[in-house]
């Protein structure tokens, strides 16, 4: 059973909607909703909340903000948890409600720290028709407010293309704003996590631009200390996800598939902490033959390791 509430009273269609998925985010939800409601824009926007049968204070907090901001929220309160039943929240409940030109995202445990975030992103997309999406840099924090990393990279603002996504680049969902066509062209046949499909679809339809501005916080939650073994297992799981994702895409040549799978593996080994994890174990976990991939990229790996040895002395 689904209970829907709406505080939308305006007749005009907002220019932007914000997809906000909530499940037991009560400890962090006020940060999220404060960031969403504090946006300074010269256009109307709406917030589409989906609460997946939270058992904590989340529903109460959402209703509190609905009363404070009666023109912003359209909310679905689930009686039974949908995610645990294998139901896709975005494609089943959120995407069918979208009526706006642009779509932004922010889960209930993430939050925005720039009151001009939506305005900056919409201004950019309005003046760059060749771009399908835009995003800013992010800060990564733990369950409290302690920074894990201030920014994911120090690179300057730049354009990303499909080649980048297929090679292992994902865009921070808490910071991205996409054109409606990204949602309209969503491929429901691809069985993968939403972050990958979002990045792939956006990059397939146009350039994706990264602004230098740091406008969002991604909260990395989890209990206990993450050991190096835990981290390796997590990265292996992510590699499996990429492998399965690549297999579902229609590449014109088999070598093209190998090319992108190789790039993702090398990216993880060199840049994401798997260089201390035995390569044979990586292959075993992936359950596929990557001998050619290993031979093809071994020189690059050696150069990378040698460089790391000398630069860390």
Where are these regions (language model features)?
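Short aromatic/hydrophobic "clamp" motif used to bind/position activated sugar donors
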Residues: 103
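A conserved acidic beta->alpha catalytic loop
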Residues: 51-60, 80, 107
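Conserved nucleotide-sugar donor-binding catalytic segment
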Residues: 96, 136, 153-232
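Short, well-formed alpha-helical segments that are part of the catalytic scaffolds
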Residues: 25-38
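Catalytic core of nucleotide-sugar-dependent glycosyltransferases
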Residues: 164, 218-222, 227-255, 277-286
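Glycine-rich, basic loop-to-helix element that forms the pyrophosphate-binding segment
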Residues: 78-99, 120
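Acidic helix N-cap motif at the loop->helix transition within catalytic regions
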Residues: 30, 56-65
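Conserved donor NDP-sugar-binding/catalytic core segment of glycosyltransferases
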Residues: 116-149
